[in-house]
Amino acid sequence: MKVLFAASEGVPFVKTGGLADVIGSLPRHLKSQGFDVRVILPKYSDIPICFREQMLKLTDFMVPLGWRNLYCGIEKLKYDGIIFYFIDNEFYFKRQGLYGFEDDAERFAFFDRAILEVLPRIDFQPNIIHCHDWHTGMISTFLKSHYRNNPFYQDIRTVFTIHNLQYQGVFPRTILQNVLGLGNEYFGLDGLEFYGQVSFMKGGVNYSDILTTVSETYAEEIQLPQYGEQLDGLLRHQKRKLHGILNGIDIDIYNPDTDPHICVNFSRETVDKKHINKESLQKILCLPMRPDVPVFGMVSRLVSQKGLELIGSVLDDILALDVQLVVLGSGEKHYEDMFRSASRRYPDKVSVNIMFGNTLAHRIYAGSDIYLMPSAFEPCGLSQMIALRYGSIPIVRETGGLRDTIQPYNEYTGEGNGFSFTHFNAQDFLYTLKRTISFYRQRNIWSIIVSNAMQCDFSWYKSAQKYQDLYKKLLFNGDR
């Protein structure tokens, strides 16, 4: 079976979020099961030069977009056994950053149209194009509108994965004809129309053969007004083709037993060595080296989705306790300022690192005792799975993938791998945090919780098998 992954970012080339991790991992696992899997991305100037220098140009051609024909080059690079293709157009992709430009509608409409145009030119006819998030939402639309009578494309099926419904790619109606080259028949409730504008996300939802999202709970949540981002009615209507499949993590990269980024390697059997990583983390971040104090870790975008409103409401209450807090990430300025202010007021308790550093991220997972993730919503979440692997016990809100991966500790049965609370309420969060600390102080119980956490399997194996089953069902049973 031939599968083409189409996405706007992917590890190791460019990354702004969890989507890139999926693109860097899932294709490899499918390939190991005998699939011919390839990936196609924009050729951003942000891609490190060490990769750009290895790319081989295959061809170039003109892509029709609205009333124009635009240059497109296609380049190829094999990495970790996977063939990656890169769509090249310097006007659209030679910029600092990936998203947030005024012409994003044009940029990603071009990308989606170029993907379809390039396939016969590289002699690759996939059975399935697996599209990811709004940036690739027009691929299934274009297949229906521009390519349905072309024999090359008639048997291609599409899967569209929603990684985060909050980002929908909504643009003025004028792009319908000027950029997309579509008639008014595509501007309706069963098409691209979204409150008088054009939604790329709706293109993916309405015109793809199968919809997936990145956890079972999130697939249920987005059909509700609270989480549906004004598309809940449409998603309820399309629920027959909607499937929730939990993301996995790359257990080779996130393996405390072999991780080159951390001070001392350890495993579930040698978890006593974890304390050395804690001491190292405290030392490099200039925190008092106290083995008895619980270290809370956060590696996160600093945005409202991550529950920072809750943390801000009770931050002084938390820091009045005998704890340390380590934060790594960047995002909205008022949250950055909130943590900076806390580090000035509590210099012996708080280390704030407004940036992203991969090595420091690994060291926080390895050196922290408790991992904070009280998200307002979380489609899947990878950080809590990584934290479990390193024996850092998550405190989460029961939403999306957090609900699917964290089993609250039961002191009567000894089961559970973390702690959770249900309502988006600061006092509930604070109560859960204090309860977690009380178990941390009971070292025998804490050892059981850490052991439970580190034996969890969130590799891609089970998730990749579910995607395989979905692909086969789509192709061989004709279910759409």
Curated annotation (Swiss-Prot):
Disulphides: none
EC number, as in UniProt: 2.4.1.21
GO MF annotation list: alpha-1,4-glucan glucosyltransferase (ADP-glucose donor) activity; alpha-1,4-glucan glucosyltransferase (UDP-glucose donor) activity
CDD domains per UniProt: GT5_Glycogen_synthase_DULL1-like
Highest taxon of the lineage: Bacteria
Gene name as annotated: glgA
Binding-site residues, ADP-alpha-D-glucose: 15
Top-rank EC class of the record's enzyme: transferase
Assigned keywords, A-Z: Glycogen biosynthesis, Glycosyltransferase, Transferase
Gene Ontology biological-process entries: glycogen biosynthetic process
Family statement: Belongs to the glycosyltransferase 1 family. Bacterial/plant glycogen synthase subfamily.
Pathway linked to the protein: Glycan biosynthesis; glycogen biosynthesis
Catalytically driven reaction(s): [(1->4)-alpha-D-glucosyl](n) + ADP-alpha-D-glucose = [(1->4)-alpha-D-glucosyl](n+1) + ADP + H(+)
Record has Ligase as a keyword: no
Keyword Transit peptide found: no
Function summary: Synthesizes alpha-1,4-glucan chains using ADP-glucose.
Protein name per UniProt: Glycogen synthase
Organism (species): Desulforamulus reducens (strain ATCC BAA-1160 / DSM 100696 / MI-1)
